[in-house]
Amino acid sequence: MAKEIFFSDEARNRLYEGVRKLNDAVKVTMGPRGRNVLVQKSFGAPAITKDGVSVAKEIELKDALENMGAGLVKEVASKTNDEAGDGTTTATVLAHSIFKEGLRNITAGANPVEVKRGMDKQAAAIIAELKNLSRKVTDKKEIAQVATISANSDSAIGGLIADAMEKVGKDGVITVEEAKSIQDELNVVEGMQFDRGYLSPYFITNAEKMQVELQSPYILLFDKKITNLKDLLPVLEQIQKTGKPLLIIAEDIEGEALATLVVNKLRGVLNISAVKAPGFGDRRKAMLEDIAILTGGEVVSEELGRTLESATLSDLGQASSVIIDKDNTTIVNGAGEKSAIDARIIQIKAQIAETTSDYDKEKLQERLAKLSGGVAVIKVGAATETEMKEKKDRVDDALSATKAAVEEGIVIGGGAAFIKAGAKVDLNLSGDEAIGADIVRRALTAPLRQIAENAGFDAGVVANSVSVSKDDNYGFNAATGEYVDMFKAGIIDPVKVERIALQNAVSVASLLLTTEATISELKEDKPMPAMPDMSGMGGMGGMGGMM
């Protein structure tokens, strides 16, 4: 396959054309009055979205060089979404503005490497200033405001997320699912829940709900299979004397052991239930240890020289109640010591910070939530499947933005924070470095300009009004067309989202500006294959005689 090579200004201009097309499609979604984008799907109904990263992911351009430019900015949107969960449109608009302004200066003779150095210095200074302008999220109202802004001014979604975060805490897990009705719902699971149900329906105590309900049970934790009844007998005899229920959590329980437990349950000798341990391999061992710490018990493990026969009541955990259905087990109010649980939480947080695997990080965060607060499930309802998907995207964005706000704090929203931070930075650079710094400073108005433009206002007038004001909280409410104190109006953005959007935008724009050559595949126009020779088929008329 032949390759096509472009150099210098020609290469950068072709790359810019791809960035411009991507930006034009994404930028219309920005702000409270942003517009929808309709996306054709290979099958089914078209998708309607106001989510910047969803729009960006759908864009593939015919020209290979333009597609390379668009692809790099798509990566910015995707990376911003992965790290901050929101701010994808902001990052795209910033990257386009920086690249456009930088291209003009480099075409006029500026040194790309010096320009890049100035851009990096300016971005670092602005991020530091954003942190100075930020404030901590202090109450449920501010959480609701952040979520509402990120959900495209949907206050119902904002309130739902604030309720969920209040109930499970900042370390709790909040998941988003599709509801079976048109109503939004919030379900909160208190205590630790894991996805293992009862091993036999004969353990059920509440036939109406098809659940096992154990009050103040002992909890036996074993990391191997239990098949032999005699191994269990000593601990069962001790439990019978107490008159309390027993929950057994083990790798598996089968054969004679399970049959005998069921018989004892049916005869009323013991109030007992059994479930499989959650997870697999090393993760199973870690989760059993989590349950042990939460309930104040110990894992009976042959690796530690313990056998099931040696288990005593002091090895067993306890909880105020346990509820088991066919799919899940929930342990409420474990009897573990708070200091031990806190130490375990610190240990898991350290593992989250160290791991590089997204899958491992997700599983560790689930374990952290189960230990620290619980799990909230937001069920999103809508009249049609298309509306459901669009709404679910907005809830996911709002949830990520809220977590980012709790993590690093908030600044004024609507693109005004960038302008206020930029006004406070004066690096006193010279030469082409100063040009690079000025490129970033100019680009900082782009998000506010776009928000104003989408709302039908004069972008230049709005940007100038915010720039000249000395009030750090002064900004433009695009929903009403008024200039307001942004904190008081509840128009706020997470610092983390602004920081990551700017970092990623400067990073990709500087890469594009320092590109001196591009290599892409040359599409060759292949001639249509010739039609086969049909001349020999003339005699087929005589085939009628075959009848």
Curated annotation (Swiss-Prot):
Residues binding ATP, per UniProt: 29-32, 50, 86-90, 414, 477-479, 493
Q: Does the keyword ATP-binding apply?
A: yes
Q: Name one GO molecular function term.
A: isomerase activity
Looking up Pfam families in the UniProt record yields: Cpn60_TCP1
Could you list this entry's UniProt keywords, alphabetically sorted: ATP-binding, Chaperone, Cytoplasm, Isomerase, Nucleotide-binding
UniProt key word Isomerase: yes
Query: Where is this protein found?
Result: Cytoplasm
Query: Which reactions fall under this protein's catalytic activity?
Result: ATP + H2O + a folded polypeptide = ADP + phosphate + an unfolded polypeptide
- GO CC field: cytoplasm
Major location (coarse): cytoplasm
The entry assigns this protein to a family as follows: Belongs to the chaperonin (HSP60) family.
Assembly notes: Forms a cylinder of 14 subunits composed of two heptameric rings stacked back-to-back. Interacts with the co-chaperonin GroES.
Protein name in UniProt: Chaperonin GroEL
Q: Name the source organism.
A: Campylobacter rectus (Wolinella recta)
Primary gene name: groEL
